[in-house]
């Protein structure tokens, strides 16, 4: 059972590698293709660059449609895939309405500044201050001591 799971995961990873641009060329026996190093993103855009200038667009976020195609030999299975240039879909059939859907696996950050430990420490401190007066620790809570915060 474990071997079947391992084979399934391995084949899934290999097929995902073939879908990524520039990771494998040809078959598995030909080896890996060396990729070019990425350009660092522009830190501060200068005033003489136009908004559509290519140096303002990070390389990581470019769509595969607009990325330059490598010259020479490539994966023939990937070369057969036609990427439409006019914004159409490469999947035939009925079109689904595309809305602003968020991916399920990615969490959105909503601006919480406090970390988990800070929230736990503040909760513990609040509990220390408002807990019932019947049961107290042997030592009183010292607000200036870092040990009284958690």
Swiss-Prot record:
Secreted among keywords:
yes
Q: Where is the signal peptide?
A: 1-25
Task: Report the GO terms under cellular component.
Answer: extracellular space
Biological process terms from the Gene Ontology for this record are: adenylate cyclase-activating G protein-coupled receptor signaling pathway; adrenomedullin receptor signaling pathway; angiogenesis; feeding behavior; negative regulation of blood pressure; positive regulation of angiogenesis; positive regulation of gene expression
Region Disordered, as annotated, extends over 28-102
Residues the record marks as site: Required for CALCRL receptor interaction: 109, 116, 121
Q: Which InterPro entries match?
A: Adrenomedullin-reg_peptide
**Keyword field:** Amidation, Cleavage on pair of basic residues, Disulfide bond, Hormone, Secreted, Signal
Q: List localization entries.
A: Secreted
Which cysteines in this chain are paired by disulphide bridges?
Answer: 112-117
Point out residues bearing the modification Tyrosine amide: 149
Q: In which tissues is it expressed?
A: High expression detected in the submaxillary gland, kidney, stomach, and mesentery, followed by the pituitary, lung, pancreas, intestines, spleen, thymus and ovary. Expressed mainly in the intermediate lobe of the pituitary, with sporadic in the anterior lobe.
| Propeptide feature: residues | 26-100
Annotated GO molecular function terms are: hormone activity; protein-containing complex binding
> Record keywords: Ribonucleoprotein included?
no
Which family is it part of? Belongs to the adrenomedullin family.
Its annotated function is as follows: Intermedin/ADM2 is a peptide hormone that plays a role as physiological regulator of gastrointestinal and cardiovascular bioactivities mediated by the CALCRL-RAMPs receptor complexes. Activates the cAMP-dependent pathway through interaction with CALCRL-RAMP3 receptor complex.
> What name appears for this protein in its UniProt entry?
Protein ADM2
Chain's gene name: Adm2
């Amino acid at each position: 059972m474990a071997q079947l799971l391992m084979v399934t995961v391995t084949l899934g990873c290999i097929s995902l590698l073939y879908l990524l641009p520039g990771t494998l060329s040809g078959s598995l026996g030909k080896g890996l293709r060396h990729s070019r190093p990425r350009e660092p993103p522009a830190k501060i855009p200068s005033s003489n660059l136009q908004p559509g200038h290519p140096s303002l667009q990070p390389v990581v976020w470019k769509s595969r449609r607009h990325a330059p195609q490598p010259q020479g030999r490539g994966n023939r299975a990937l070369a057969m895939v036609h990427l439409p240039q006019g914004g159409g879909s490469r999947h035939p059939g009925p079109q689904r309405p595309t809305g602003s859907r968020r991916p399920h696996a990615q969490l959105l950050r909503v601006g919480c500044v406090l970390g988990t430990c800070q929230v736990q420490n503040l909760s513990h401190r609040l509990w220390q201050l408002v807990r019932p007066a019947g049961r107290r620790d042997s030592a009183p809570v010292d607000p200036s001591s870092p040990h009284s915060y958690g």
